[in-house]
Amino acid sequence: MFESFQLNNSQTQKYADNFDITLPGRNISHGTLHPTTLIIREICDAFRSMGFQIHEGNEIETEKYNFDLLNIPDDHPARDQWDTIWLNLTNNENNYLLRTHTSPMQARIMEKNNPPIRVVVPGKCYRYEATDATHEWEFHQIEGLAIDKNISFSELKGTLYQMARKIFGSDQQVRFRCDFFPFVEPGVDMSILWEGRWIEILGAGMVHPKAVSYTHLRAHETRHD
């Protein structure tokens, strides 16, 4: 190929004379994974090491699974068109929307599986938010659900302690405070101590008995991470 190559001018000839085809080629730069992808994988790996399975859910959900089966009342502000992105796909049975959280998978998993259950559901969620430094209409969330006989709130705390220490370090300080979510009772938020201040990283609680009652499972057998 090089023997038949025709040089057009003296400048090209100059560079061609200095060209060494025996030199090794340059490595092509490869892209890297997005930080969000990396942390999602790290969190999933932490739960996987504790016996959890990884599931994925639907980004287009129905009002039934996104709200009704999660004990979210009809007059809850989250159902408002200014908080939820509703889709023009309404039929006689379902009102469709872009899921506002990954929690709809709770009901779907409880419908189709029997205890013991240990699952984690990472995925994108959508809310009608004004974009600023801490808010975006598209964001990521990771849902956890554990169902078994006679498991307790202390086991929930222990699971989350273990996850936090795998992600942030074995000496990480954490705290739990009471919080409210319609689909858990009791509910808590969990914070970590980072550079001298507490930062909330998740919400959790025991699955609300009403949310369980919509499935074939018994309320005393459930826990929500």
What are these regions (language model features)?
Residues 1-218, 223:
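TRNA-recognition modules of translation machinery and tRNA-sensing kinases, especially anticodon-binding
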